[in-house]
Amino acid sequence: MQATETKDRAVYWGTGRRKTSVARVRLIPGTGQVTVNGKPGDTYFNRIADYLQGIKAPLETLGLENEYDILVKAHGGGLTGQADAVKLGVARALCELAPENRQPLKSEGYLTRDPRAKERKKYGLHKARKAPQYSKR
């Protein structure tokens, strides 16, 4: 999560995680395009607008939605987990961009890592909490 110079352009890094998804996010000065694993964001997320809106939400909070391109390498989990991981990664990259961005992003909840994950299966049960059918006699 550091700023690096690439071809005379500043690149800001952020990593986000959600469930089993991990997203490594780069912010590059540009026009607001989202690229995930080499594909346009709307193609990767099957044109589900909520995912793209969520990804761009931290930028919109700061009024920077058309100033940075978002380049993402995401793996693990499903589309919802990856979209939330990207959102966290974008917010962390914006904190690298300027430390004063931290307070508005934190107050909106974009810097909070969602700790919920799948609960492990226990022996003697069918799933994490589903018990076999009880028979009184």
From Swiss-Prot:
This is Small ribosomal subunit protein uS9. Residues 104-137 are annotated as: Disordered. Belongs to the universal ribosomal protein uS9 family. Residues 118-137 have a biased composition (Basic residues). Transmembrane segments: none annotated. The gene is rpsI. Keywords: Ribonucleoprotein, Ribosomal protein. InterPro entries: Ribosomal_Su5_D2-typ_SF, Ribosomal_uS9, Ribosomal_uS9_bac/plastid, Ribosomal_uS9_CS, Ribsml_uS5_D2-typ_fold_subgr. Coiled coil: none annotated. It comes from Gloeothece citriformis (strain PCC 7424) (Cyanothece sp. (strain PCC 7424)). One of its GO terms (molecular function) is structural constituent of ribosome. GO terms for cellular component: cytosolic small ribosomal subunit. Pfam families: Ribosomal_S9 (PF00380). GO terms for biological process: translation.
